[in-house]
Amino acid sequence: MSPHYIGTMADAADHDAGQDVRLRARVEGVVQAVGFRYWTVRKAEELSLTGTVRNEDDGTVAVVVEGPQSVVLEFRRWLGSDDAPGRVDHVEESVSPATGEFSSFDVVY
């Protein structure tokens, strides 16, 4: 684990809300073939976040998103809400400092 690992979004609340963070999320449920990636891109772009979203072979969706901690928290809440397409049963997450690796938010195939 990186020495800069923060934990979950709940743990990140103890940090500066303006600090840029990276959220890695694995979304479980009925999240493939329901437009989940498309809506995830739209939500990330609406919030001016960067990162990627991709379908995994096990039926989950992997999301990596970077931006200000308070905005990433809003995005994380959306990921697990009824507003997200399909049916989200569980979101596994980890948070670390942002790397600045991304310049946009894209679907990875």
UniProtKB/Swiss-Prot annotation:
It catalyses: an acyl phosphate + H2O = a carboxylate + phosphate + H(+). GO terms for molecular function: acylphosphatase activity. Keywords: Hydrolase. The active site is at R37, N55. InterPro entries: Acylphosphatase, Acylphosphatase-like_dom, Acylphosphatase-like_dom_sf. It comes from the Bacteria. Residues 22-109 form the Acylphosphatase-like domain. Gene3D superfamilies: 3.30.70.100. Its EC number is 3.6.1.7. It is an enzyme of class 3 (hydrolase). NCBIfam families: PRK14427.1 (NF011001). Belongs to the acylphosphatase family. This is Acylphosphatase. It comes from Arthrobacter sp. (strain FB24). The lineage of its organism: Bacteria, Bacillati, Actinomycetota, Actinomycetes, Micrococcales. The gene is acyP.
